Amino acid sequence: MSGRTNIARFRLSKASVPRAREHVRLVLREWKLGHLCDEAALVVSELTTNAVTHAAQGIGDQLELVLRRRDGVLVVEVSDSYQWEMPELRKPAPEETSGRGLLLVDALSQAWGVRPRTGAGKTVWVHLAVRHGGEE
């Protein structure tokens, strides 16, 4: 089946990161996409961690997680209210202890990007290939 969508909202707090990961795992198992659980959970972990870290300076207190299954692609979107700085891929120095999240996202995804939201904030989107298994 194509065209499935799931939308969930979480508070901008560190406790939401594992909740968002578990939510993704539950949804993907329900959609018979269990083979994507690890990749999708890692992507969601990185994106929600970034939202919690940076969007706490924004005007809202929630993030939105959207999962979409369409045309052989799982689309993962994380939206928040922080609009002053858009995420960009960078290569951290070896001694830095953070800054590698988008490198992981880039390595796991077919494509990813960021777009501003209407009103305030941004959405970071990621396309993961549905390589095998699951409903088609």
Write out the residue ranges for each language-model feature:
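Conserved small-residue
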Residues: 20, 47-50, 105
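A broad, low-specificity signal for short, low-complexity segments enriched in glycine/proline
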Residues: 25-29, 36-41, 73-75, 85-89
